[in-house]
């Protein structure tokens, strides 16, 4: 992720061009022509990782369908990395559904919005996730309920993890995913440099 004012400007221009073109293409090919959803979904995120200069190294093989991906959360960049490599639908906090532009992209990506602070909605929100899994789709969940600098995994706060206990008979697959930002500009990342990309 090399930085310079000129490179930042170029990336901004590419971002402005890429987002409307790719999102419009995704809408047209999937919702109009009924083509494969995740092909264009992942293409959108891969374009973003390329624009931002993010190189991803993957260890292990992700499940293809009907899986609950349980992941640590460090940065908004996590979304790009996971979205470009997993056939999964994100679970996001309900506030994001009110963010201009971002909310439209999330809805296009079938994001499941949840209110983590409303205990009375937990049952309905668990059903939303289980319905997706029952259809053979996979879901990406950040059970820590917040982000960190990535030095450790925070205690799980998400009551949505109860879906595993309550739906034992469904035999859902659970795959843990760990994200680590190991290099910045090609150099190993020390703890003091993590605020460059971590949101906590």
Name every feature range the model reports, one short phrase each:
Residues 19-34, 38, 49-51, 67-120:
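Catalytic core of membrane glycerolipid acyltransferases/transacylases, capturing the structured
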Residues 1-3:
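Short, Lys/Arg-rich, polar N-terminal cytosolic tail immediately upstream
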Residues 65-71, 88, 137-141, 172:
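Generic beta-sheet signal
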Residues 103, 151-200:
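A cross-family acyltransferase "interaction/gating" segment
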Residues 7-22:
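Alpha-helical bilayer-embedded segments of polytopic membrane proteins, i.e.
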Residues 122, 129-130, 137-141, 145-156:
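Soluble extracytoplasmic domains of inner/organellar membrane proteins
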Residues 60-63, 128-133:
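Short amphipathic alpha-helix with an adjacent loop that forms part of the alpha/beta core around
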């Amino acid at each position: 992720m090399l930085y310079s004012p000129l490179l930042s400007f170029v990336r901004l221009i590419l971002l402005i061009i890429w987002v409307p073109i790719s999102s419009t293409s995704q809408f047209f090919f999937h919702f109009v022509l009924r083509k494969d959803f995740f092909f264009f979904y992942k293409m959108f995120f891969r374009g973003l990782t390329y624009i931002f200069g993010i190189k991803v190294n993957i260890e292990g093989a992700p499940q293809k369908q009907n899986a609950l991906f349980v992941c640590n959360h460090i940065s908004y960049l996590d979304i790009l990395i996971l979205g470009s490599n997993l056939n999964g639908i994100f679970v996001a906090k309900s506030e994001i559904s009110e963010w201009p532009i971002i909310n439209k992209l999330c809805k296009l990506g079938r994001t499941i919005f949840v209110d983590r602070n409303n205990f009375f909605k937990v049952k309905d929100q668990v059903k939303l996730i289980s319905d997706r899994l029952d259809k053979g789709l996979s879901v990406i969940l950040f059970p820590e309920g917040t982000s960190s600098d990535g030095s450790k995994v925070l205690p799980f706060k998400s009551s949505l993890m109860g879906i595993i206990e309550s739906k034992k008979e469904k035999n859902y697959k659970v795959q843990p995913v760990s994200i680590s930002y190991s290099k910045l500009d090609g150099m190993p990342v020390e703890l003091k440099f993590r605020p460059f990309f971590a949101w906590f």
